[in-house]
């Protein structure tokens, strides 16, 4: 049980949840309105295979980062299993290596677009953490890595993989573009805020984060502005969208989350590492919710049509 708990912490649960929701949300966007059965064996093989490949790739990326950040994590994240000794470095290497190989094998076995999606993600994740490249040393490049994988590669790559696998033309339609743009900007906010709780270790090991360059107050404000823009843009788009959509649900849900964001931000004291970390996890919860709310807004009109 202790080993399982350590592995769960090693996998960085918030990223595992985010990866899971992104795979299933993109799958739902693929089938919505196209008349394909969610329960057909062929479609479920595709989504479960993609889910497993992406989860293994996720563990590879976050695990590799921990292997190269052990000393920093002993200051910033002492609860992680490599930093506190629950896993040895050798064990960490085995986990990362096996997950990376298995992820690529499954992805390429299922198809070109999934192979490219996972392969590109792993290459960027490696460049993010591993010297001599180690892009995480530079705030702009670090943010670019995160938004490229989470915002672009995963959403568009998975969508094309599912489209082709389900027999649809390999075209990127409006719903996936809207989700991708929202997630892209949202991921920028996550990328710039993620280092606010880690100032002490980053300063000591000369990691040039945006927080150290412009201060945590400015990063905090910038994060709120970016997230506000995301929610307002989605609500405005809902008014003008020329496609089947539950407009009221989309607008009300996003404005409610925007209000919750600002209400929650009032309680954050930037001198408290605990409160900053808690707010960072709250931002991830908002990220999770988007992958639930957006497909639901597209599904509700179809659902109501089948009822009435």
UniProtKB/Swiss-Prot annotation:
Presence of the UniProt keyword Cytoplasm in the record: no
Regions crossing the membrane: 13-33, 44-64, 104-124, 142-162, 173-193, 219-241, 245-263, 279-299
Example of a GO biological process term: vitamin E biosynthetic process
Membrane association type: Multi-pass membrane protein
Phenotype on disruption: Impaired in biosynthesis of alpha-tocopherol.
InterPro entries the UniProt entry points to: AtHST-like (IPR044502), UbiA_prenyltransferase (IPR000537), UbiA_sf (IPR044878)
UniProt KW rRNA-binding keyword: no
UniProt entry keywords in alphabetical sequence: Membrane, Transferase, Transmembrane, Transmembrane helix
EC numbers on record: 2.5.1.115
Functional pathway: Cofactor biosynthesis; tocopherol biosynthesis
GO molecular function: homogentisate phytyltransferase activity; prenyltransferase activity
Top-rank taxon, per record: Bacteria
UniProt catalytic activity: phytyl diphosphate + homogentisate + H(+) = 2-methyl-6-phytyl-1,4-benzene-1,4-diol + CO2 + diphosphate
Gene3D superfamilies linked to this entry: UbiA prenyltransferase (1.10.357.140)
Pfam families: UbiA
GO cellular component: membrane
Compartments reported by the entry: Membrane
Described function: Involved in the synthesis of tocopherol (vitamin E). Catalyzes the condensation of homogentisate and phytyl diphosphate to form dimethylphytylhydrquinone.
Family statement drawn from the similarity comment of this UniProt entry: Belongs to the UbiA prenyltransferase family.
Protein name as annotated: Homogentisate phytyltransferase
Source species of the chain: Synechocystis sp. (strain ATCC 27184 / PCC 6803 / Kazusa)
Biological classification of the source: Bacteria, Bacillati, Cyanobacteriota, Cyanophyceae, Synechococcales
């Amino acid at each position: 049980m202790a080993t399982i708990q350590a592995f769960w912490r090693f996998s960085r649960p918030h990223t595992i949840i985010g990866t899971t929701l992104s795979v299933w949300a993109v799958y739902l966007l693929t089938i919505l309105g196209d008349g394909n059965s969610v329960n057909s064996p062929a479609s479920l093989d595709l989504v479960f295979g993609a889910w497993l490949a992406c989860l293994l790739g996720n563990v590879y990326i976050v695990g590799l980062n921990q292997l190269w950040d052990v000393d920093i994590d002993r200051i910033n994240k002492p609860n992680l299993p490599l930093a506190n000794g629950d896993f040895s470095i050798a064990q960490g290497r085995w986990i990362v290596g096996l997950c990376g190989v298995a992820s690529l094998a499954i992805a390429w076995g299922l198809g070109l677009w999934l192979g490219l999606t996972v392969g590109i993600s792993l290459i960027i994740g490696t460049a993010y953490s591993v010297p001599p490249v180690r892009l995480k040393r530079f705030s702009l490049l670090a943010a670019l890595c995160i938004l490229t994988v989470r915002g672009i590669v995963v959403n568009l790559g998975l969508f094309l993989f599912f489209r082709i696998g389900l027999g649809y033309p390999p075209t990127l339609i409006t719903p996936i573009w809207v989700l991708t743009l929202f997630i892209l900007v949202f991921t920028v906010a996550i990328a710039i805020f993620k280092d606010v709780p880690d100032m002490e270790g980053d300063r000591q090991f000369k990691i040039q984060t945006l927080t150290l360059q412009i201060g945590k107050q400015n990063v905090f404000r910038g994060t709120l502005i970016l997230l506000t823009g995301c929610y307002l843009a989605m609500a405005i788009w809902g008014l003008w969208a020329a496609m089947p959509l539950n407009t009221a649900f989309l607008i009300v849900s996003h404005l409610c989350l925007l209000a919750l964001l600002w209400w929650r931000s009032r309680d954050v004291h930037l001198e408290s590492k605990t409160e900053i970390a808690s707010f960072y996890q709250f931002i991830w919860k908002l990220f999770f919710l988007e992958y639930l709310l957006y497909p639901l807004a597209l599904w509700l009109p179809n659902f109501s049509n089948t009822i009435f």
